[in-house]
A protein has these predicted regions:
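FAD-binding core of FAD-dependent oxidoreductases
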Residues: 1, 119-128, 154-155
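PLP-dependent aspartate aminotransferase-fold enzymes
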Residues: 1-85
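Short acidic, glycine/serine/threonine-rich loops at helix termini
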Residues: 4-7, 44-47, 99-103, 128-134, ...
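A glycine- and small-aliphatic-rich helix-loop capping segment at beta-alpha/alpha-beta transitions
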Residues: 8-15, 48-50, 105-110, 132-141
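Active-site-proximal loop/turn and secondary-structure-junction residues that shape catalytic pockets
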Residues: 38, 94-95, 124-126, 153
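Active-site phosphate-binding strand-loop segment of PLP-dependent enzymes
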Residues: 67-119
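Active-site C-terminal subdomain of aminotransferase-like
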Residues: 87, 95, 114, 139-181
Length: 181
């Protein structure tokens, strides 16, 4: 599910520059910002999508395992100066190891201000939004360009079931559709 969402992020980032990465490949260095606590599929997706695993910049977390927004802002600024294209910001909505939920609202606002795709990895923790005691922790989810959830982890579906939700389905279509041979 993260792979699909980040494929949309890649398409969106390059289309803003007038380039179609699905058709013509990646033509410059990009960056995906994810916390030190991100799931390994984020790095794996970098390799599969042709941007490289090293395009994933791991951002420091606070003592509760949440991404430090100040470090995110610094990383984006440094990459812009270096000519690296910010492609996506990945927020955790409940990490697998600790259940930490990143500051979604602050991260989403940074993404919006910088025209960066905002992806929320809710594979493990997103069903927590249904609990009134913690639903406030998910404020900012509405800013996401993509969100994933794995219903088999909390919601009783079959193992391996995952869902990817995107704001712009046509972007996803362009990222993964190919013409007949």
């Amino acid at each position: 599910a993260n792979l699909i969402a980040l494929g949309g992020a890649r398409q969106s980032a390059f289309e803003r520059l007038g380039h179609d990465p699905a058709a013509d490949g990646v033509n410059r260095s990009v960056r995906v910002y994810a916390s030190e606590e991100c799931h390994h599929t984020i790095q794996r997706s970098g390799g599969v999508l042709g941007i490289g695993r090293h395009a994933i910049k791991l951002i420091a977390c606070d003592s509760k395992g949440r991404m430090r927004v100040d470090c995110l802002q610094n990383a984006i600024a440094e990459d812009k100066v270096a000519g690296v294209l910010p492609m996506a910001i990945v927020a955790n909505a409940g990490t697998t190891n600790t259940g930490a939920i990143d500051p979604l609202l602050a991260m989403g606002e940074i993404a919006t201000e910088n025209s960066i795709w905002f992806h929320v990895d809710g594979a493990y923790g997103l069903p927590g939004i249904l609990d009134e005691k913690i639903s406030h922790l998910f404020h900012g989810l509405e800013l996401a360009d993509s969100v994933i959830v794995d219903p088999h982890k909390w919601l009783g579906s079959s193992v391996g079931v995952a869902a990817t939700f995107v704001r712009d389905r046509q972007c996803l279509y362009r990222a993964f559709t190919q013409e007949p041979a």
